[in-house]
Curated annotation (Swiss-Prot):
HAMAP family attached to this UniProt entry: MraZ
InterPro entries: MraZ, MraZ_C, MraZ_dom, MraZ_N, MraZ_sf, SpoVT-AbrB_dom, SpoVT-AbrB_sf
Keywords, comma-separated and alphabetical: Cytoplasm, DNA-binding, Repeat, Transcription, Transcription regulation
Cystine bridges: none
Residue intervals of the SpoVT-AbrB domain: 5-51, 80-123
Protein name in the entry: Transcriptional regulator MraZ
GO CC entries: cytoplasm; nucleoid
Protein family according to the UniProt entry: Belongs to the MraZ family.
Species, as recorded: Myxococcus xanthus (strain DK1622)
Chain's gene name: mraZ
PROSITE patterns xref list: SPOVT_ABRB
A GO term, aspect molecular function: DNA-binding transcription factor activity
Gene Ontology biological-process entries: negative regulation of DNA-templated transcription initiation
Gene3D superfamilies per record: Transcriptional regulator MraZ domain
Primary location class: cytoplasm
């Protein structure tokens, strides 16, 4: 499972290193291929291919004319691109995805159990602040209580 937050740089060619701990999890549990796609929060999601294929199969079973499904397919599936790691553990992030997430020089990788988020440093700081403000909401507290009982 992916966990932790890691700050990295992105070079002029759009490459960034996948943090070693995330790479070890990826290689140990999956393989070295990631699917990058746009996320609804103006970041990118990096899925191991196996997790992505499971998501696609679940979506394929749904009615594509259902509004939520159609929107997810347009925003999530249509933007997805396979991005293998190079021999140095770097990922080339396509220009359209870099632009969408505002990735320029400093990026933040965030392990989110089965998916990895890739943020601009500024976007991550804003998302963290929003999460802190929501942390005491009844919904968050309910989920936390359920997790502790499991």
């Amino acid at each position: 499972m992916f966990r932790g937050v890691y700050e990295h740089q992105i070079d002029a060619k759009g490459r960034t290193s996948l943090p070693a701990k995330l790479r070890d999890t990826l290689v140990g549990a999956y393989d070295e291929r990631l699917i990058l796609t746009t996320a609804l929060d103006r970041c990118l999601h990096a899925y191991p291919v196996r997790e992505w294929e499971a998501l696609e199969l679940s979506l394929a079973k749904r009615n594509p004319m259902e509004p939520g499904v159609k929107t997810l397919m347009r925003l999530y599936v249509a933007s997805a691109q396979e991005c293998p790691l190079d021999k140095l553990g770097r990922l080339l992030i396509p220009p359209t995805l870099r632009s969408y997430a505002g990735l320029e020089k400093e990026v933040v990788w965030a392990g989110m159990v089965k998916v990895i988020e890739l943020w601009s440093r500024e976007g991550w700081a804003k998302a963290q602040e929003e999460a802190r403000q929501e942390a005491t909401s009844a919904d968050v507290m309910k989920v936390l209580a359920e997790l502790r009982q499991a």
